[in-house]
């Protein structure tokens, strides 16, 4: 048996490490024989496939580049010109995929476009065009161009169906289309498509691995719908297959997403453990600095929310170092600096936190990062400046954060800014000596706090599962209510206090005796000279958004203590108030109904 035959046999058995050795041996032999250009082409092309499976991406790019040069060389014999063009298309396609693995998206799209242009010159090439478009859609999605990704992937599915392609290709394209819908926050649609694909795969032989990848994507969609237990089951089913097959990269990425699922439930220990295992595998595989840095950043945020800001800072600095080595990761470095700023804030190293957050804003702007990333950085910067008793400087940052969130249609997050600013205004009012200024500050704070609290209360209807609804009430609605009641008490507005309590008692957010002592009597030590009145109606605030399922929860800010309580407004340590949930960067994971007003974001996905 020749080295090439043995390599092909090992490749079919998915023993990629041994196959690579035999392909390299065969390639060395063919390089000495000019008349063996065709065999040399097949050898280096298959070598590239195995190298990619082994996550040796640079070597894979080199192998495919050699294959492309041979396919374009007129001295390489082909039976027909169509055969030559087909090989060129497939080689450009493989180059596009491996470059996408390295996050070299511009180069990747160039190869897919070239492949598609060649395919269009061939008759009866609709199936080939569909496959190329499917891969192109994946890259467009990774770049954040989800409108184009949806159009291209939809066209790919139509091409394959029209061409009468194999069911496997159609089901795989359905999975990819579902992934685009996940990124677009159209999660119910994604769930339906993924169930359809899984059912289709199950009727075909040899599709266990494809089913596992579909389950991993299904888990992502379920996670975004707040159906964490179902997501956990799907991640576990996928993990079993991945480990049995020995696909280390699939194991690693599945662990990464599973860690997000744990973190969003506040299962910090499980999330920490799972992130650590994923990162260990990333190191073994030599995964890109971009992906490693992004995962380290999410891990850091989880550690911070678990109450260990010192360790979180250490991990976050590792993330920043990795991202600084990555190509085109400036915007992500800015996001990591947002997390670092929060770690420093939690340690009361406020000047350092301010410096980190200012640099975060600069980098996100400079690299044309997402509006929501900029908004989080601006909000956190406002918090840190306000915590240093410089509210006048903090106010423009709160305003910009609110504007950016609203521009993205992220109404919950805009109310998160309202809550932060209300807390800062309350503390500012406590420092004010002029009675009229104190009253004016309380009026403004109360307006913002009531708006945020009513919004948080109404969003409980977005949760079909009782455990998720209670988590929302305990970690979001109750802390928001406490701040609003505290401010109403400061303003000595007994009518507002009564209306708030009656409204939330009816909705089940408060019990008749939960935390109302201060609200009933106020703080006699700090009465305003002239009682302030609320400027926001109690009913109907943000109702249309809640009814439409707008917004999400969770924040880069972390917000609140692990038990979901609220720290006293005069104590800036460990702030701020709100949900103690993870908002992983680059994944925009949330705990609400995950409605379509959320901004675009990049996700790890399965193809």
PLM segments and residue spans:
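Amphipathic alpha-helical segments of tetratricopeptide repeats
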Residues: 27-31, 66-77, 114-124, 155-165, ...
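Alpha-helical solenoid repeat scaffolds used for protein-protein interaction
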Residues: 298, 310, 317-325, 330-333, ...
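Short, charge-rich amphipathic alpha-helical segments embedded
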Residues: 28-42, 124, 505-518
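Alpha-helical segment of the N-proximal tetratricopeptide repeat
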Residues: 2-28
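Inter-helical turn/loop elements of alpha-helical hairpins
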Residues: 11-21, 51-66, 70-71, 101-106, ...
């Amino acid at each position: 048996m020749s080295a090439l035959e043995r390599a092909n046999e090992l490749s079919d058995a998915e023993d990629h490490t041994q196959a690579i050795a035999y392909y390299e041996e065969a390639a060395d032999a063919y390089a000495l024989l000019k008349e063996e250009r065709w065999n040399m082409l097949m050898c280096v092309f298959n070598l590239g496939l195995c190298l990619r499976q082994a996550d040796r991406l640079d070597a894979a790019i080199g192998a495919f580049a050699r294959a492309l040069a041979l396919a374009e060389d007129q001295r390489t014999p082909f039976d027909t010109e169509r055969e030559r063009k087909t090989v060129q298309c497939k080689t450009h396609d493989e180059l596009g995929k491996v470059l996408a693995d390295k996050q070299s998206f511009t180069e990747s799209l160039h190869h897919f476009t070239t492949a598609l242009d060649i395919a269009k010159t061939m008759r009866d090439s609709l199936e080939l065009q569909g496959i190329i478009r499917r891969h192109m859609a994946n890259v467009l999605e990774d770049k954040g161009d989800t409108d184009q990704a949806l159009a291209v992937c939809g066209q790919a599915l139509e091409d394959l169906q029209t061409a009468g392609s194999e069911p496997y290709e159609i089901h795989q394209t359905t999975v990819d289309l579902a992934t685009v819908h996940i990124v677009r926050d159209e999660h119910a649609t994604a769930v339906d498509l993924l169930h359809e694909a899984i059912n289709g795969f199950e009727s075909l032989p040899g599709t266990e691995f494809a089913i596992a990848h579909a389950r991993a994507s299904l888990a992502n969609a379920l996670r975004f719908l707040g159906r964490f237990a179902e997501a956990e089951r799907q991640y576990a089913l996928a993990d079993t297959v991945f480990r049995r097959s020995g696909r280390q990269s699939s194991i690693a990425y599945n662990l990464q997403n599973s860690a997000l699922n744990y973190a969003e439930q506040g299962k910090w220990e499980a999330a920490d453990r799972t992130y650590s295992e994923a990162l260990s595998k990333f190191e073994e595989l030599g995964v890109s600095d971009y992906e490693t840095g992004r995962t380290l950043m999410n891990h850091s945020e989880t550690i911070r929310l678990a109450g260990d800001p010192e360790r979180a800072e250490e991990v976050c600095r590792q993330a920043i170092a990795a991202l600084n080595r990555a190509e085109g990761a400036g915007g992500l470095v800015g996001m990591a600096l947002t997390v670092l700023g929060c770690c420093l804030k939690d340690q009361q190293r406020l000047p350092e936190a301010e410096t980190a957050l200012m640099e975060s804003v600069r980098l996100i702007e400079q690299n044309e990062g997402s509006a929501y990333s900029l908004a989080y950085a601006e909000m956190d910067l406002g918090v840190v400046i306000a915590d240093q008793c410089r509210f006048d400087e903090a106010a423009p940052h709160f305003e910009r954060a609110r504007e950016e969130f609203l521009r993205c249609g992220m109404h919950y997050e805009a109310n998160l800014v309202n809550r932060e600013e209300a807390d800062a205004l309350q503390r500012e009012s406590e420092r004010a000596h002029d009675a009229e200024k104190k009253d004016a500050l309380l009026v403004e704070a109360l307006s913002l706090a009531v708006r945020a609290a009513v919004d948080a209360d109404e969003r409980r209807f977005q949760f079909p599962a009782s455990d998720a609804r209670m988590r929302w009430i305990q970690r979001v609605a109750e802390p928001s209510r406490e701040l609003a009641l505290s401010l109403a008490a400061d303003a000595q507005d007994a009518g507002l206090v009564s209306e708030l309590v009656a409204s939330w008692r009816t909705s089940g957010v408060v019990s008749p005796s939960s935390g109302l002592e201060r609200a009933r009597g106020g703080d006699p030590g700090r009465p305003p000279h002239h009682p302030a009145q609320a400027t926001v109606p109690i009913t109907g605030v943000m109702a249309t958004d809640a009814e439409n399922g707008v917004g999400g929860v969770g924040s880069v800010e972390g917000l609140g203590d692990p038990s979901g309580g609220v720290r006293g407004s005069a104590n800036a340590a460990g702030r701020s108030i709100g949900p103690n949930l993870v908002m992983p960067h680059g994944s925009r994971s949330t705990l609400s109904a995950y409605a379509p007003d959320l901004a675009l974001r990049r996700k790890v996905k399965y193809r």
